[in-house]
Amino acid sequence: MTGWIVLPISLTAFSIPGIWIVYAMAVMNHHVCPVENWTYNLTCTDDNTKAGTPKSCCTLEDVPLISKCGTYPPESCLFSLIGNVGAFMVVIICLLRYSQVIEISQRSWLNTTALIAGCTNAAGLVMVGNFQVDYAKSLHYIGAGVAFPAGLLFVCLSSILSYQLAASALDYWLGHLRVSLTIVALISLVLTGVFFIQESFLMQHLVAICEWIFVLDILVFYGTFAYEFGSVSTDTMMAALQSSAARSCKSPGSSSTSTQLHCNAERIAMI
């Protein structure tokens, strides 16, 4: 067992409580209404709610979307921090998983596509976390439009790879768990898109609920990599580097003597 097992656990343990803290701060500061509220008004002329308690009058501007919760300070500061740190962890997890699959099996388009999807998901998270929806709506929506589908694609491909690499009953059970999480993510994301284009109060509130389910589901999925990361070693990254070096040496146009000598030198350096 290696220390890398802490990374996926840390992502889940840091991000899930973090976004709930952001939500609680937004509710207490009257920036959004609580998720259990299902009553909305067209306008709120006078809200006599006491400080430190949830709003008593809510409009569509107060729907507790995750992005809305992180729009205004002070919660926006924590929201950006969670987005940036979480994105960095996601990239490291994707790189390690990519290298681990190469070490166990061989290079495949599924593995490469999963790496690209995971890194794209991280890039979208950075945009979502740093461009608040009320101040940079276009950039925020671009980030969300990139992060959510890329995250779904990553979990889909990772679930397939889990079955391809399964060698024990526990591996297959983990694959079943990941497929279940993937199905939940797919359903919640599709419903988010369907409800988002509706203008009714009920539909917009359902958007918030589906969005929360999707994000929490994806974070739990990333946490499941703790199972495989117990076997990550220094040889894991080397396997990816050696595979890349071997591929470049075998590429067309690399048959010259100087290129072959360079490739041989790289192989010797990796030993």
Curated annotation (Swiss-Prot):
Its main location: membrane. The keyword Magnesium does not apply. It comes from the Eukaryota. This is Transmembrane protein 150A. Keywords: Cell membrane, Glycoprotein, Membrane, Transmembrane, Transmembrane helix. Residues 1-3, 97-108, 162-182, 227-271 are cytoplasmic. GO terms for cellular component: plasma membrane. Glycans are attached at N37, N41. Residues 25-75, 130-140, 204-205 are extracellular. The chain crosses the membrane at residues 4-24, 76-96, 109-129, 141-161, 183-203, 206-226. One of its GO terms (biological process) is phosphatidylinositol phosphate biosynthetic process. It is a multi-pass membrane protein.
